[in-house]
Amino acid sequence: MESQQLSNYPHISHGSACASVTSKEVHTNQDPLDVSASKIQEYDKASTKANSQQTTTPASSAVPENLHHASPQPASVPPPQNGPYPQQCMMTQNQANPSGWSFYGHPSMIPYTPYQMSPMYFPPGPQSQFPQYPSSVGTPLSTPSPESGNTFTDSSSADSDMTSTKKYVRPPPMLTSPNDFPNWVKTYIKFLQNSNLGGIIPTVNGKPVPPMLTSPNDFPNWVKTYIKFLQNSNLGGIIPTVNGKPVRQITDDELTFLYNTFQIFAPSQFLPTWVKDILSVDYTDIMKILSKSIEKMQSDTQEANDIVTLANLQYNGSTPADAFETKVTNIIDRLNNNGIHINNKVACQLIMRGLSGEYKFLRYTRHRHLNMTVAELFLDIHAIYEEQQGSRNSKPNYRRNPSDEKNDSRSYTNTTKPKVIARNPQKTNNSKSKTARAHNVSTSNNSPSTDNDSISKSTTEPIQLNNKHDLHLGQKLTESTVNHTNHSDDELPGHLLLDSGASRTLIRSAHHIHSASSNPDINVVDAQKRNIPINAIGDLQFHFQDNTKTSIKVLHTPNIAYDLLSLNELAAVDITACFTKNVLERSDGTVLAPIVKYGDFYWVSKKYLLPSNISVPTINNVHTSESTRKYPYPFIHRMLAHANAQTIRYSLKNNTITYFNESDVDWSSAIDYQCPDCLIGKSTKHRHIKGSRLKYQNSYEPFQYLHTDIFGPVHNLPKSAPSYFISFTDETTKFRWVYPLHDRREDSILDVFTTILAFIKNQFQASVLVIQMDRGSEYTNRTLHKFLEKNGITPCYTTTADSRAHGVAERLNRTLLDDCRTQLQCSGLPNHLWFSAIEFSTIVRNSLASPKSKKSARQHAGLAGLDISTLLPFGQPVIVNDHNPNSKIHPRGIPGYALHPSRNSYGYIIYLPSLKKTVDTTNYVILQGKESRLDQFNYDALTFDEDLNRLTASYHSFIASNEIQQSNDLNIESDHDFQSDIELHPEQLRNVLSKAVSPTDSTPPSTHTEDSKRVSKTNIRAPREVDPNISESNILPSKKRSSTPQISDIESTGSGGMHRLDVPLLAPMSQSNTHESSHASKSKDFRHSDSYSDNETNHTNVPISSTGGTNNKTVPQTSEQETEKRIIHRSPSIDTSSSESNSLHHVVPIKTSDTCPKENTEESIIADLPLPDLPPEPPTELSDSFKELPPINSHQTNSSLGGIGDSNAYTTINSKKRSLEDNETEIKVSRDTWNTKNMRSLEPPRSKKRIHLIAAVKAVKSIKPIRTTLRYDEAITYNKDIKEKEKYIQAYHKEVNQLLMMKTWDTDRYYDRKEIDPKRVINSMFIFNRKRDGTHKARFVARGDIQHPDTYDPGMQSNTVHHYALMTSLSLALDNNYYITQLDISSAYLYADIKEELYIRPPPHLGMNDKLIRLKKSLYGLKQSGANWYETIKSYLIKQCGMEEVRGWSCVFKNSQVTICLFVDDMILFSKDLNANKKIITTLKKQYDTKIINLGESDNEIQYDILGLEIKYQRGKYMKLGMENSLTEKIPKLNVPLNPKGRKLSAPGQPGLYIDQDELEIDEDEYKEKVHEMQKLIGLASYVGYKFRFDLLYYINTLAQHILFPSRQVLDMTYELIQFMWDTRDKQLIWHKNKPTEPDNKLVAISDASYGNQPYYKSQIGNIYLLNGKVIGGKSTKASLTCTSTTEAEIHAISESVPLLNNLSHLVQELNKKPITKGLLTDSKSTISIIISNNEEKFRNRFFGTKAMRLRDEVSGNHLHVCYIETKKNIADVMTKPLPIKTFKLLTNKWIH
């Protein structure tokens, strides 16, 4: 450590901030701090002289200016007005320094808190300001430890000794040489000891001082180290003990020491609030802080012990249950009182986990109870304990104690008829004659309980316990799957549990059951008298060791925890269990099988079971009468609007739901059943507060007190659909009403209120007295207020900011919306039917019983229960009868979806998507085999057709017998007339309806039946959203809807390009989103529409044969410029003649008349490019299934990482099934699933505005680089790494010496700060970093970021070599066998003089913060330093080295032999002759400190680190560019979870994902944190992408546009990109040397564009640049203008590439004198035709006409060859859209791998 040099002038006094100030003789009644500076005792002549010349307080004086703070004051004196801990400094008026503490090279003053200003720091009296320990006692460090005894004298003795040893504390001398540091530090330590600070010095035994407190959260740990520090300082006796009292009384000296050290190591800003509260009362009461801290430590210890005890509970009945209960409840109460809340669920889990023995089965009973409490659990424990105590001597025991087994080796067997044994002592009999009892209980397979038992030692063969595979019913039995399940952690896999309490054998697997048959008369109950459903009964056959076979009866049920083998049934076949020998044996002693003891149970292996050939359908399909078969719970759950199981059971028990009873439902899966639609639709943050309204109203009669609230608006809906709804809830009955609203106007609200009041008055003969509402304008307006006043109704408004009072209406709206989202998610119906889902939910909710009242709202209102047979699941597919068809041969059925029962008739409201209307009708048939969204999730075999038929049979019979068929059904919510639609499109509708019910559909033949009511299964799918502007009447649903309309390849041209049918196809009817064979005879559901209008497209018609007829249909064929266009974004096309269009079919690549001197120019350009090799594709024939296909209008505006604007996305029709890599990435969410769950691919544009959303952000300019440097305090002051700290200190001295050597500032004069204009004063700082080669570097820099504009010339620029120039030079070096030499110029900027008059503060080690020095050199960080250095080195290279700068490319210099690329202080030299490089180096060394990093003279592979690129170069062969080492170091520091699932990504993103642009709701602190995180992540990704990972630029650019919109989705996509970078960090950009026979250089730009796939229909454009077949750069960006067609987007992309292509051409010609050929490659033939066309009239009126004309002139004037490239070979495709894995790899694996 260096000394503190305060000044170079001797008259400035020196001293430490911690040194005491001693005065001369002072009277006892006088404050020593009032003594003037002239009376301070001088300690040498120099200081005497200095003091005589001063008129103010010396710089080192510790005398404060506010004298009242230094005088003794009682603890009651309030703290200063600026707060309890204002920073104050011990200084004179001219020495203000805002910088505060500065630890290495400290400034001349130190700020002081009220600690230091207190009387304890400067105690009054004649003694010195820093009390000294008497010589008899010594310093705290020199005395024995407190354990050896107390050696302190009393306070009077200490005072006298200190008074006698009074002396002035002399500061240490100045350090003048590094060699003197050992001697100097000894004097410095002596100085600290004399200043009563010896306790902070590490002792000889190495005991450290306490660390600095840096956070309030660290205070508990810090105070432990501080107490240890006091103990090491022989002050352990003053520390409070457990009872809060110290061993001895603290002296004044010790209190001073305690006070000083506490304030040094615990800065006030880092103290906890409770510590600050103590100090605010008495800022000297450190002892109270220590006492309180020790109390907290003891409390934390008790809490930890309680938590450990609770987590390790063990109970087996050996102790009384009361004692166990008391112990547990006391622990829980203590934890709750200490703020650690243990809820019932957690407590029950912890208790049950510790149960063993007879109590272990209670682990699973919780699955049969909802919300089990601790008290309920202990009731069960007490019941078992009492039963255990009562039957200990009388109960037959099959698992005896070892003492019992000595006397009797045989277990007791009962050969009599099995009888029921109940655990509950209150229920000993069972009324059912054929009742068996299972010893364990049914449980879920996913039980989270754990087992603490371990397998006991056994003489039997070892058993494999790690089989975790589940053998499901119906799975083929193999040897490897005998151990089929592991249902719980304490089960022994592959074994049967031997149970003496079970009267029947039960097994979960059907594969061991022989002769299975149903037996509905058997009723099995568990220990808690709950029914266990039985699927079948059969025989269990054994083949034992003695080759004997036997069988017993077995019951099949999946609802048990273990497979149970009844000892009673074994005894019936003469088999007993001997637990002494641990074997099964016959009565004659023949051993049959070993027994294994595992945990508390005994087991026998399943290997002795004979498997059967029975299949699962045989078990499940055993004939059972419909009268006895129970309804599956998932079916009832969906039928009743996805209500929870508890509510449904209450409703059935209380008959609020009629037609069947609670026993008719299979509740076995109700507890563990998770409905995916409920999880998605009902996801919520937290629950509303219940019971809060009770303080606002009294008790009312039914329908006298109503709650109301309005929800909405719902955006992007058709005009016919409501945007709001208003709900009403009766306080007493909880009856609900909902009414749709299209707006929130006063008259609309008034109409609803009039309706609801009239309904209640007429139907319930009640009068509404009070209506509770919020303070929305729709309720507080004068019109409604007068209406309520007129009707005598009191409006009850919620108070401001008291939303709790409106809990009833809020909870109802939340419940209805949860149900709505769930119903829409489950059914797949469009969003404009949302209110129908609300109505359906309201009907059901009014019929469900409340758990509190045990009645439903309908029962409270006096209404009958809801007949469930009148309900259909929401969205149930049906076929509606068309009562008025267009003709007699017209199909009579229309596909539809059931919504809810009609309010106005006995009919049902059904949605007809083909007609865009809903009808009220009874003329419908349920469509079998289709459970709407059940195919989306794995519902196993949940098909409810039979259940639905049984349920609705009585209702349909009622309709058939009692209702007269109406001639006209009631139409509601119709967008247009039903009959008129049929008349407009008769042929179209006929095709649709015939397809919808065609028996030749793709359903397997086995699904057809002879029942006339059953309709064949069809893949009908409700559309996710319907555009209100679509006029087609045949919008049929598909099973899965693709986010991107599929484009089929219609014809393969002779050139290899693809003509695409420019019409989106509906997704086919299959599980996967793929097309079947085009020649398949199965029909497909396509969309039909009218023919295209002439003003939209210029099509020729291709004849297509229709199915089953001789007439030819025509499919519109797109013209050439339409091949890249999507119908959803149609724009006026360019009219091209037929001859021009046809000519494009045969000329590939296309040549211009004036740019093709040779026939094979274009071929040679394409031949050298790293394009993918594609297998030849046969011509694709059109399918007979094609009809006239309509467009789909879409208004999608979501920002995309692929999807709807993807002009190059298509699907090959003749492919039977596309592979996984063609459709999706390895992310498990597919494109279809993502869009179904998160997006609305047919939604209109959103009107919401996002907060913090910017319209467009440039990828690089918006990114802040990651800070890799350290500040002075981080590198040295607070650096805990001693070795690293030493290296940084060495780097610091090296930098200072370099600055002095370079004469960076004027050392002859120091300026006073007041003399200099403040705007010319530049702040300075030291920054430290660790370079990639491991060296530590320090840099003294100026704060140019706050530099005044008047101090530099804004016109000067700091130039560095462009990355394209470096890549071009490297590429030419490889092709021409150049030597590459890398140089570094040390402190380059310091070689440049500075013209302006600027001043900086001196470095910290000088200690001259009040002085300034004038700069002479361009210090790093100044605005002008870069420009000054550039001019300096440029002048030297030109004049002394004979170089010249390449025009247009700054920092690129060349002469006849050498090329130099300059990047600040790094130089890269390229030359054919290595001696030429050496000559340049010799010249540079004459002027600059030049270091050779890599001479590059080896002929083997040479590794470089050039500007962040890790380059491997072997002259004449190859060059590889990567960043593996850098990424390996940097990415883990980003705190991104890497490889969370242990797998690697194969693509950086997923096709078809859209960034949701809804309003971002986030608090400000979290927003700033996430923006900062995005800046770090995208900053690193951008750095890597623009260096060499050009394949990632699209993703980087898209995410960079959302840096200021850090939603969860954006962050997840960014994490995925970083994950891909990590997985592919070893990838390199590969270059190979060009063929030596090539006569010229070839510079090519490949262009591509994705039309309208960015927000607001902006297009993404991308370009890749190649030199001699080597990729040297790429660019991906969003088009600045909104393009109106694909052609315009392609023209925009090409025009963006031309300027850079021309500049690169000039650079290549300057560096290499070979001729150059320039090429432009695109996959847009329409763009090429425009460029080569001479006809200007055809696009004169187009939006892009001027840009096209300019592009044509540039192509002609710059001799550019425009060539066509196949889309599948266009590697620029990766710049414009996310691609499937296979395509992404195909386009990139040749140039980066």
From Swiss-Prot:
Active site residues per record: D499 (for protease activity)
Domain (RNase H Ty1/copia-type): residue spans on this chain: 1648-1790
Start-end of Basic and acidic residues biased regions: 1076-1091
Keywords: Aspartyl protease, ATP-binding, Cytoplasm, DNA integration, DNA recombination, DNA-binding, DNA-directed DNA polymerase, Endonuclease, Hydrolase, Magnesium, Metal-binding, Multifunctional enzyme, Nuclease, Nucleotide-binding, Nucleotidyltransferase, Nucleus, Protease, RNA-binding, RNA-directed DNA polymerase, Transferase, Transposable element, Transposition, Viral release from host cell, Virion maturation, Zinc, Zinc-finger
Reverse transcriptase Ty1/copia-type domain location: 1376-1514
Region RNA-binding, residue ranges: 337-439
Subcellular location: Cytoplasm; Nucleus
Residues bound to Mg(2+) 3: D1648, E1690, D1723
Binding site for Mg(2+) 1: D709, D774
Ranges where the Integrase catalytic domain occurs: 698-873
Region annotated Disordered, chain positions: 1-84, 126-174, 390-459, 996-1208
Primary localization: cytoplasm
EC number: 3.4.23.-, 2.7.7.49, 2.7.7.7, 3.1.26.4
Bridged cysteine pairs (disulfide): none
Gene Ontology terms: biological process: DNA integration; DNA recombination; proteolysis; transposition; viral translational frameshifting
Catalytic reaction list: DNA(n) + a 2'-deoxyribonucleoside 5'-triphosphate = DNA(n+1) + diphosphate; Endonucleolytic cleavage to 5'-phosphomonoester
UniProt biased composition (Polar residues): 1-10, 48-60, 127-152, 1043-1053, 1092-1120, 1133-1144
PROSITE patterns associated with the record: ASP_PROTEASE, INTEGRASE
GO molecular function, one term: DNA-directed DNA polymerase activity
Motif (Bipartite nuclear localization signal): 1216-1250
GO CC field: cytoplasm; nucleus
Chain's role: Capsid protein (CA) is the structural component of the virus-like particle (VLP), forming the shell that encapsulates the retrotransposons dimeric RNA genome. The particles are assembled from trimer-clustered units and there are holes in the capsid shells that allow for the diffusion of macromolecules. CA also has nucleocapsid-like chaperone activity, promoting primer tRNA(i)-Met annealing to the multipartite primer-binding site (PBS), dimerization of Ty1 RNA and initiation of reverse transcription.
PANTHER family linked to this entry: TRANSPOSASE, PUTATIVE-RELATED (PTHR42648), TRANSPOSON TY4-P GAG-POL POLYPROTEIN (PTHR42648:SF11)
Miscellaneous notes: Retrotransposons are mobile genetic entities that are able to replicate via an RNA intermediate and a reverse transcription step. In contrast to retroviruses, retrotransposons are non-infectious, lack an envelope and remain intracellular. Ty1 retrotransposons belong to the copia elements (pseudoviridae).
Name of the protein in its database record: Transposon Ty1-H Gag-Pol polyprotein
Organism: Saccharomyces cerevisiae (strain ATCC 204508 / S288c) (Baker's yeast)
Lineage of source species: Eukaryota, Fungi, Dikarya, Ascomycota, Saccharomycotina
